[in-house]
Amino acid sequence: MNKSLSKNLRRYLCLTVTIVLSVSVSAQKDFSSIQTGVDVGDANIIESGVKSFEEIERRLPRRANSFDDDNSEHHATKGWGLDYEYYKYTYPTINTKGETIILTALAAMPTNYDVPINNIILGCHATITDNKSTPSEYIKSGDWKTDVGMLIMHAKSKSASELGYNCLVILPDYQGYGNTRYQAHPYLAQEITARQSVDALRYGIELYKKSKKGRAKIRDGWKTICVGYSQGGSVAMACHRFMETNFLDKDLHLGGSVCGDGPYDPIATMKFSVEEDKVFMPVAIPLILKGMLDYNPYMRRHKAKDYFTEKFLKTGILDWIELKEQNVLDIQKALRKFYKFHKDKRGDYLKASEIFTPEVFAFMSKKIKGEPTEKNPKFDDLYSALNVNNLTENWKPKYPIYLFHSKVDEVVPIGNAESAYQRMRTDKNPNIIKYTYVESGGHIMSGLAFFFAIFGKSYEQKAVEAIAGGERTWNLFNP
């Protein structure tokens, strides 16, 4: 090769490397630039350690007021991206009465401090009925194939260009789980769950900010992205809405939300169950009703017996929900001791008319058909309580939302996604909501399709990356 050409080529390569490194360094900022509006002194680390993405490692219980990094085990020692750092912490928030309560959450982050944090993922877990399935318990006995396991994968160390990885992941337990497991969970009480989850996010950021020097900075242009499936899908959307409507979107760099098969419209969900007279996940109905009876101002004057048949209540299902010892499948199995389940091509189900009293079933049947109903406080209050938690009403999002839904979801019908898309998008901003409707797969299989991909990237990962890249990548995103 010509010496002059070789020399110029070396200079060009050196200059290119210098520019790339310069851009890499300058395109970062310190976490101290993030304004959360909360005091880190009110939060506490109660457990921390390093866990492998390949195997469960030994817990390292500690206490602190920051994500401390002076532990030698808090660094990748098994190769690029094989470990993540976790922290279980408590933080203050409020309940439906405006009283201060202390909740738990889990934070996960890369062990490689040389690559900047790309984004912050607010991971919202799906419907659970047992405390062992909470995010903070995942570090002890969780299965990586669950939604929590998949959300934690965003903390995996990879190249800085992989915007779906190298993330700080915050996973709230929700009220009624973790250290409040003996309290009722406000199931589908969207605003309060969103408030509590966003508080977990804010305190998680503050704990990271107070860590010692050496921890990774965050990329310039980072986003907070709310992600979840099933109940987690609706909580993700509710958190998105809460940040927008409470002026937290700028400080927290809200990017948008990625929502899979979520019950955004409780009326649409109830309509499906009553019209078909089929409930494929029977525990969902008492979860919804119990949450409203415990926390909704419309419903506090009523009792469970006002809505459920005596036979259904005698199964002990409300006790199972309160104890939080049995998971959803355990409860489904326990109900078989009292009921003979029916079956169609989508799976096993109980009739809605076997769960609701005849009066409630008749009222709901008329209401969803638009037929006149007699005035009755306990029925009218039920409908009002369902409607007040409808995320698709009275809100036009300013930030992107990706909806994923199975057209044949037997638990959370496609009407939820259609309601969100039709009511929340506008002609002025038609691309603010994008969606993928898959042709097959019930609620469980749809969740696998959302988080997993045999080849290439999953729907969830592609949507996270589209939002993380900003307006240009979102506009190019064609799900």
Predicted segment positions?
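Short alpha-helix in the alpha/beta-hydrolase fold that links the catalytic acid
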Residues: 239, 399-400, 413-424
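Accessory cap/linker subdomain of secreted extracellular hydrolases
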Residues: 260-394
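Alpha/beta-hydrolase active-site loop
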Residues: 149, 187-211
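Catalytic-loop region of hydrolases
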Residues: 28-114
